[in-house]
Amino acid sequence: MNVYERTQQRLKTVFDLFDNIYVSFSGGKDSGVLLNLCIDYIRQHGLQRRIGVFHMDYEIQYRDTLDYVNRTLAANADILDVYRVCIPFKVQTCTSMFQQYWRPWDGSMRDIWVREMPEGSLTQHDFPFFTDEMWDYEFQNRFAEWLHRRSGAKRTCCLIGIRTQESFNRWRTIYSDRNHYRCLLYTSPSPRDL
């Protein structure tokens, strides 16, 4: 069985078991392939359902990546529920000797934003759990819980595209024996059927 066939098997399992599915989509190669596989799966199998797309918009991004994200979301609006978040969470930085983190979409720095916030974006006011001390990765985890409650789903699945060849830590995350669901490996457990 080749990688594509194995992916189709895994997607069938995901779509059979979870009533709420969303893809974490950065606009990069890995998440782009995964999102397009999901879109194709829905269309090829005639599924009458939508999937969520969680896009953390970091304000500063390559123009081609922004164009790709916008094009992909617009072309598939009929089956995608888009959660494009523009949040001033803390983000690690190695470009400053004076700051350990920076904040995209920081309202107090609006006059130097790199670009305008995209129309229809979700902001910190849409998330009651957001605090100024929150880091981007903490926000991701809290978003999953928020979306699960908001959707009223029985089971929520977040799909993340990862190439393990890029990092030993990524490889360890994927090939860990700690987390199983119906004989399938997954990266991290969450409470309440997430």
Predicted regions and their residues:
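ATP-dependent adenylation/nucleotidyltransferase module used to activate substrates
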Residues: 1-188
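A short, hydrophobic C-terminal helix/tail in secreted or cell-surface proteins
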Residues: 189-194
